[in-house]
């Protein structure tokens, strides 16, 4: 565009100068010189553009897991910018778990010409993918448990990181320390794509063992709290996958279940630092860092790779919750290469 404008300016200059007695040769020389200058300016602009990127970070809603990922992304972008001597401008957006708001953010981000979009969590990723369809702006999502189920695969401008849950590992943990379980509670949001596959896997696991289960769902904090409270006295343990809706109420849910003597097994370590008993999942700081690296590599190379599944073999236990429940979790040492002890965050 800059070159086109410069050439038009040179042509206008030729017409004006011809009226002042310039010959065609003189005019051609002037046009050639102007075009050369325009090419040099364009080259300089391209170089400057390659050294500067604008990135939109779109968080689905506020809660500990997604906050941890966002902070890790920002830190890594800052570190890589300093290391490479480039400028990476990023701006945070928050959809408050509302599809309309997220769609508006997507429209704004694309219109503002961001070079890449990093959505955190499934609904944010779906909305950003739709918004970027016409421009093919790279979308590098973070923490999508099942990209295929979320319809985020086989799209040439979309990739990212998956925190796919190993549901069997969490179920194995449950029965390792509570071998006499009779009934398991399954607490989740039926609007969360992240929960669909692991809940189905949990049911299949429990059916195979002949263990009963009680399902409770909700789509707001109040509904989740009501569901959790109703499980007290009905179940011996509760399982929640990487469910963003439940995570938003994790502290209150954990407190309610612990007071009721019910261990709360979850899909992410951020639940555990909110008071849940234990998890076997990914490290979200590592996931955020990897996502940022993917985004920068795509910006620099233009190559969009397949999505990456993070290693989730880390067991995290809340020692305060374990003590309150009177549970000996030493059996976890036989199930994972690493057992991390944590306490409830203030």
What is each PLM-predicted segment?
Residues 18-38:
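Bacterial lipoprotein signal-peptidase II cleavage site
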Residues 49-75, 80, 91-100, 191, ...:
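Extracytoplasmic "Venus flytrap"
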Residues 55, 73, 163-206, 306-324:
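An alpha-beta-alpha
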Residues 56-58, 110-122, 140, 184-187, ...:
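Periplasmic-binding protein-like
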Residues 97-115, 127-130, 223-236:
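Short, well-structured alpha-helical segments in soluble
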Residues 127, 131-167, 266-278, 343:
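Flexible loop/hinge segments that line or gate small-molecule binding clefts
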Residues 147-153, 159-182, 282-302:
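Hydrophobic alpha-helical segments within soluble ligand-binding/sensing domains
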Residues 297-346:
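Hinge/cleft segment of the Venus flytrap/periplasmic-binding protein
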């Amino acid at each position: 565009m800059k070159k086109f404008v410069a050439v038009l300016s040179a042509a206008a200059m030729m017409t004006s100068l011809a009226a002042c007695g310039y010959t065609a040769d003189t005019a051609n020389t002037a046009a050639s010189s102007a075009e050369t200058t325009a090419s040099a300016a364009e080259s300089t602009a391209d170089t400057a553009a390659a050294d500067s990127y604008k990135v939109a970070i779109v968080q689905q809603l506020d809660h500990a897991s997604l906050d941890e990922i966002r902070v890790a992304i920002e830190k890594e972008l800052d570190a890589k910018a300093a290391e490479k001597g480039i400028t990476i401008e990023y701006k945070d957006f928050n959809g408050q778990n509302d599809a309309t708001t997220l769609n508006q953010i997507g429209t704004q981000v694309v219109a503002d010409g961001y070079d890449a979009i990093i959505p955190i969590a499934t609904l944010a990723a779906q909305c950003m993918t739709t918004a970027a369809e016409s421009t093919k702006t790279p979308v590098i999502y973070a923490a999508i448990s099942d990209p295929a189920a979320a319809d985020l695969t086989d799209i040439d401008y979309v990739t990212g990181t998956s925190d796919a849950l190993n549901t069997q590992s969490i179920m194995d943990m449950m029965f390792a320390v509570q071998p006499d379980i009779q009934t398991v509670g399954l607490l989740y949001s039926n609007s969360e794509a992240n929960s669909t596959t692991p809940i189905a896997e949990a049911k299949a696991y429990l059916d195979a063992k002949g263990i009963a289960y009680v399902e409770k769902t909700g789509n707001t904090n109040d509904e989740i709290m009501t569901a959790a409270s109703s499980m007290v006295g009905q179940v011996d343990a509760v399982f929640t996958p990487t469910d963003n809706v439940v995570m938003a109420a994790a502290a209150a849910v954990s407190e309610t279940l612990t007071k009721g003597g019910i261990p709360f097994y979850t899909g992410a370590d951020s639940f555990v630092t909110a008071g849940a008993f234990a998890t076997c999942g990914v490290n979200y700081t590592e996931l955020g860092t990897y996502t940022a690296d993917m985004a920068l590599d795509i910006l620099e190379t233009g190559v969009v790779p397949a999505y990456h599944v993070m290693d989730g073999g880390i067991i995290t236990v809340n020692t305060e919750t374990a003590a309150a429940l009177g549970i000996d979790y030493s059996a976890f040492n036989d199930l994972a290469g690493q057992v991390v002890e944590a306490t409830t965050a203030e």
